[in-house]
Amino acid sequence: MIKITKGLDLPIAGMPLQQISPAPAVKRVALLGEEYVGMRPAMAVKEGDRVKKGQILFEDKKTPGVYFTAPASGVVSAIHRGERRVLQSVVIDIEGNEAVAFTRYAADALAELPRDTVQQQLLASGLWTALRTRPFSKTPRPGSVPAAIFVNAMDTNPLAAEPQPIILAERAAFDAGLTVLTRLTDGKVHVCQPSGGKLGGHPAGQVCFNQFSGPHPAGLPGTHIHFLEPVSLNKQVWHLNYQDAIAIGQLFLEGELNCERVIALGGPQVKSPRLVKTTLGASLDDLLAGELEEGENRVISGSVLSGTRAHGPHAFLGRFHLQVSVVREGREKELFGWVMPGKEKFSITRTTLGHFFKRKRFHFSTDTHGGERAMVPIGNYERVMPLDILPTILLRDLLAGDSDSAQALGCLELDEEDLALCTYVCPGKYEYGPALRSVLTQIEQEG
């Protein structure tokens, strides 16, 4: 077991009840184009077209053969584009239950499938896009082979669902998914679970079960990769979440694309925080109807630390998100807030009274309590960064755009979510995720 000592479990109110409840029916689903780093779509459908679940909606021009498929059957009602015609979302009004059929395999035949057969089925179904590379967090190129594959079977994000019961309820499909993944690599398939996890005993020798304990970010793929299979420009690994591993198993066992997902609804503004079963890409306007407290709220697809704001063309469940978080918009101004004791405020630096209430859950809002200022190295980043890097120097180089120094300091191992806690504790109010993405893009382009 690998024990993480540095990090932070954010004490936010609205922890979901770890029991799956019925969810409001959703009438629309969507694929969000901006979730896929560097993707340029070649559209295969237009507004008004009727599509089946699993039918191709568009292909990546930069990576031919990578297809993005419909998560439900229905009619394409809108194709939203932003500045410079960047694809924002492809929206489908759900109608019927028609689905594309794929090849089924017996469970005992999966371990002998050729690599090309596995790749072609994943590509045709759209489940290939569940895989992400590290470094760069992009969809893998068809035909490439990773040094290892990581399946994340734990989640330490604030307000997240507990993965173990969900996996155990679909254990046969999960094990089948792991077997399929072993056909894509000559290395290990690492299953990362929390301390005391009940997963283990897979027949494939390539599957390795690892346990991590400690505060967030102990449950992030970047943490697992750093300690088990560090990457470089010449070494690439892939990762995916546990529900996508289940979906891969179901695809090969049943011959149908399963887009159901169990997600956590949580946050201070959710009336009844709980787990619900819904559809990949579900409309959050439909899903949250009648679920929120009064007032101006911010709906976040994903974690409050690293998720994306869900509004307008983006008001749908993200492809890689297993939770929806809702907090209050913090627009009010506080007179002389800096001299108040701050019983209702949480601080990692012990500057507010709320720091001393260890079991208290706080009603966080979007208020950052100030604007951008100088980046002051007071040890905050080191408190929440468990990786073997120099965070203060790395973050400085990211802001300066110094790609050579940032690469030497380990930025290739990171994704935006790995720096989310650094953004949260930053006294200068900087957003380090976009700075990291800019530097990674520069490194990739320069080779």
UniProtKB/Swiss-Prot annotation:
The reaction(s) this protein catalyses: a ubiquinone + n Na(+)(in) + NADH + H(+) = a ubiquinol + n Na(+)(out) + NAD(+)
Superkingdom of origin: Bacteria
Name of the gene encoding the protein in the UniProt record: nqrA
A Pfam short name: NQRA_SLBB
GO molecular function, one term: oxidoreductase activity, acting on NAD(P)H, quinone or similar compound as acceptor
Keyword Translocase carried by entry: yes
Protein name: Na(+)-translocating NADH-quinone reductase subunit A
EC number: 7.2.1.1
Gene3D superfamilies: 2.40.50.100
Protein role: NQR complex catalyzes the reduction of ubiquinone-1 to ubiquinol by two successive reactions, coupled with the transport of Na(+) ions from the cytoplasm to the periplasm. NqrA to NqrE are probably involved in the second step, the conversion of ubisemiquinone to ubiquinol.
